[in-house]
């Protein structure tokens, strides 16, 4: 079923796309995907897989090594991780705070010492460590990061307050890898031919 959906989104009469589909590199991506995903754990993840493979055939925006990383991310991260990614992407280059993400997800207020708060901090830690998101930083004309001006605390102000899981001070944005992941996994190519899932093979990826 997934393969049929991919083909329905590609112009297989385009010489470059046809050549790409037959290439060893693309066939290797297919084998990796089918080997590691005998059955997607959710419909959303199956859709991400389909989008990645379709976009990898139609676009040369990124290398196959990066596409392989995207496939690994689908295995590594939960659907809640991807919801956080989608919210951060929606806010663009200005970034959004953890509190803003929590609000956009429609979550109710919870205590700082709750399991939900710990999980939320873990999501950001995972995505930051994985190179998907980073704290928002200004860049200069040449695309270089501008160093942050250190903020000095007044003497006698006591210990630095603990940062809330739902902090509204620091903003987060997607890295370039994160932006490309959204382009490949969360962007659905329009159908080139009509596809009826009730006809033909019913086999899931």
Which residues are covered by each model-predicted region?
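Short amphipathic alpha-helical interaction segments
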Residues: 79-80, 111-157, 167-169
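Charged, alpha-helical interface segments at or near domain boundaries
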Residues: 1-77
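Short, amphipathic alpha-helical interaction segments positioned at domain boundaries
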Residues: 146-205
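Intrinsically disordered or highly flexible coil/loop and linker segments, enriched in small
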Residues: 43, 62, 94, 133-136, ...
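Short amphipathic alpha-helical interface segments
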Residues: 60-113
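Hydrophobic/aromatic-lined pockets within catalytic cores
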Residues: 11, 89, 93, 128, ...
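Active-site-adjacent structural elements in folded domains
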Residues: 68-71, 138, 155-162
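Amphipathic alpha-helical interaction segments
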Residues: 48-51, 83, 122
């Amino acid at each position: 079923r997934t393969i049929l959906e991919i083909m329905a989104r590609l112009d297989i009469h385009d010489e470059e796309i046809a050549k790409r589909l037959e290439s060893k590199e693309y066939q290797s991506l297919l084998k990796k995907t089918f080997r590691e995903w005998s059955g997607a754990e959710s419909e959303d993840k199956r859709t991400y897989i389909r989008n990645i493979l379709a976009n990898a055939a139609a676009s040369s925006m990124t290398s196959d090594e990066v596409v392989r990383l995207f496939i690994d991310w689908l295995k590594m991260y939960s659907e809640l991780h991807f919801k956080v990614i989608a919210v951060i992407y929606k806010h663009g280059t200005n970034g959004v705070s953890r509190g803003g993400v929590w609000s956009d997800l429609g979550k109710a207020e919870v205590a700082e010492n709750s399991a939900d708060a710990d999980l939320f901090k873990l999501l950001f830690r995972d995505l930051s460590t994985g190179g998907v998101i980073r704290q928002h930083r200004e860049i200069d004309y040449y695309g270089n990061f501008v160093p942050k001006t250190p903020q000095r605390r007044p003497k006698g102000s006591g210990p630095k307050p603990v940062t809330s899981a739902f902090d509204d001070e620091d903003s987060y944005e997607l890295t370039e890898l994160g932006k490309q992941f959204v382009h490949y996994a969360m962007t659905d190519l329009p159908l080139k031919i009509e596809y009826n899932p009730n006809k033909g093979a019913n086999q899931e990826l």
